[in-house]
């Protein structure tokens, strides 16, 4: 059986990176929530 998690830095950054988050309204809200919460890491 194939494992479901096949790590790739490129895919990770494209889907969950800072620039990907900032590209959409919802993504910007995610960053804002994480800032408000005081997260050390805002995105992947």
Curated annotation (Swiss-Prot):
GO terms, biological process: translation
One Gene Ontology molecular-function label: structural constituent of ribosome
Protein name: Large ribosomal subunit protein bL34
Alphabetized UniProt keyword annotations: Ribonucleoprotein, Ribosomal protein
Cellular component, GO annotation: ribonucleoprotein complex; ribosome
Region (Disordered): 23-44
Pfam families in UniProt: Ribosomal_L34
Organism the protein comes from: Marinomonas sp. (strain MWYL1)
Biased composition, class Basic residues, residue ranges: 31-44
Entry similarity comment: Belongs to the bacterial ribosomal protein bL34 family.
RNA-binding keyword on record: no
């Amino acid at each position: 059986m194939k494992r479901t998690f096949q790590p790739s830095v490129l895919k990770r950054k494209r889907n969950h990176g800072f620039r990907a988050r900032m590209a959409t309204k919802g993504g910007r809200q995610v960053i804002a929530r994480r800032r408000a919460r005081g997260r050390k890491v805002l995105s992947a």
